[in-house]
Amino acid sequence: MPSTKFKGYFITIEGGEGSGKSTLLNQLGDYFRNKGFEVIQTREPGGTKLGESIRHLLLNHEDSISIGHQAELLLFLAARAQHIEELIQPALKAGKIVLCDRFNDSTIAYQGAARGLNAKKIQEFCQLVCAEILPNWTLFLDVSPEIGLARTQKIQKVHAQMGQLDRIESEKIEFHERVRQAFLSLVQQEPQRIYRIDANESQSKVLQKALEFLEEQWSDSELKT
């Protein structure tokens, strides 16, 4: 089990578009609450009033604002800095489980590998923003970009959004393939922290795999609280 100076645990869920992160986040939240844990569910960018405003700016087509790659990176990091200070760190200090949809790994994959920004500089920026706030464990939901984007469009049509993809979802398929390959590389670099799950499987199978991994990380006494 990774060492931590906080009483709580920080679990992040990563993956490309349409990989099922939000669904798994909700399922894990229910699971841990039923075990008696206090749980915070959050997302990036977002999680705070400032973060959600930045999210709208970054993802929305409506405003017709041109955002350069470096500006995009810094906006994501600004949202994260506020997220950590306002929500994540206090929750971890209070002994809660924090479940977060995206964190540093997404920045490395999207702004680094896919956008082509300097990987070393991104690591330095992330370290500056996060300091000691790092995930105990990360679940990477691996799905092909073609399948993931098709899922996303289907979900949006169901919610009467006319299947419109957001600013990042609408990037070319090559962009999303670079994102996937970056995540796979991170899994190889940090196998003890990051666990790959085949997100082409059913939602129940994905949840089963996630719980099997997480249950191995905790002692029985902690999980049976």
Swiss-Prot record:
Transmembrane segments: none annotated. It catalyses: dTMP + ATP = dTDP + ADP. Its EC number is 2.7.4.9. Gene3D superfamilies: P-loop containing nucleotide triphosphate hydrolases. GO terms for cellular component: cytosol. The keyword Metal-binding does not apply. The keyword Transferase applies. GO terms for molecular function: ATP binding; dTMP kinase activity. It holds the Pfam family Thymidylate_kin. One of its GO terms (biological process) is dTTP biosynthetic process. It comes from the Bacteria. Keywords: ATP-binding, Kinase, Nucleotide biosynthesis, Nucleotide-binding, Transferase. ATP binds at residues 15-22. Belongs to the thymidylate kinase family. Phosphorylation of dTMP to form dTDP in both de novo and salvage pathways of dTTP synthesis. This is Thymidylate kinase.
